[in-house]
Amino acid sequence: MSGTGVLLLTLLLLVAMAASDMLSSLIQAHERDSEESCKSYGGGPCPSGEDCCCPPGRSTGTCKRTCNNGSVCA
């Protein structure tokens, strides 16, 4: 195999490893959400750094670091 082929193969391997690490980090960040049940108006508080995220029109939700599809319970 030529030197260029070896270099390209090595570069491809490094890119694949970096992509795998990024995907693993994203999965771990998602799993760090506590997923504890919470309620607005006197429900259990969420851990520090998390909000109580409720689906639209609901007063019960789950604790998450970011409310993607819902909104922070009032």
UniProtKB/Swiss-Prot annotation:
Predominant location category? secreted
**A GO cellular component annotation in the UniProt record:** extracellular region
Q: What's the PTM story here?
A: May contain 4 disulfide bonds.
- Where does it localize? Secreted
GO terms for molecular function, please? toxin activity
Give the signal sequence positions. Answer: 1-19
Q: Which branch of life, at top level?
A: Eukaryota
Q: Does the keyword Cell membrane apply?
A: no
Q: Which UniProt keywords apply?
A: Disulfide bond, Neurotoxin, Secreted, Signal, Toxin
The answer to whether the entry has keyword Secreted is: yes
User: What does it do?
Assistant: Probable neurotoxin.
Q: What is this protein called?
A: Conotoxin Cal27
Q: In which organism is this protein found? A: Californiconus californicus
